Every structure is written in C-alpha cells, then in structure tokens.
C-alpha cells in the first residue's frame, strides 16, 4: 500500500488506474501526471522507485487539489449556501433535490430520510 495525500493506492494496479482512485483525479489528470513525471502509465505502483513516488507526491500536492482538501471545500460551499439561506442551501437543509428535479414521484430516498 502506498499513501499519497492521505489517499491509499493499491500496489498491484497500474499507475494511471491507481491515481484515478484518488478523489479529485480522473483519467485525464492521471495520464497528465504520468506524462509530466516521464513514466509510463502502464507500470504498476510497486515497480516505482522511491524517487518517482516522492516526485509524484510533490507534483500532486503542488498542482492538484485532491482528497480531503477538495471534500473540505465542497463542504464549506454547502455550509455557505445554508448560512445565506439561498434556494440551494434550503434544499440541502431539507434533504431535497436542488437542481429542479421533480419530487412528487421521484427523490423518494431523500424524502424518506427527512421523515425519520
């Protein structure tokens, strides 16, 4: 197991696939990281040298907002919506869909959670 920015990467997976398991890094960003490091995306995590791992960790830490930082930002945005009492904040508070979806026949799981 390898940990980068608090995210666990499986050693038996290819680098480009393992990086996509990090919250905030998709397939394109994973390929971009591999390209900038000068490594093939097809080699496995366990085949990387300590230097390559350090370089990857440094690059991801500097250039990309990932994992807990991204989740904290999203949570702060939702709390801000709730604090200013905008439409989206009220819908978040009530546990209802916020992008105009109908609630008469759909969104049942959201409405069940409210009744508890």
UniProtKB/Swiss-Prot annotation:
SUPFAM superfamilies: S13-like H2TH domain. Its main location: mitochondrion. One of its GO terms (molecular function) is rRNA binding. It is found in: Mitochondrion. Pfam families: Ribosomal_S13. Keywords: Mitochondrion, Ribonucleoprotein, Ribosomal protein, RNA-binding, rRNA-binding. The keyword RNA-binding applies. It comes from the Eukaryota. This is Small ribosomal subunit protein uS13m. GO terms for cellular component: mitochondrion; small ribosomal subunit. Belongs to the universal ribosomal protein uS13 family. GO terms for biological process: translation. Part of the small ribosomal subunit.
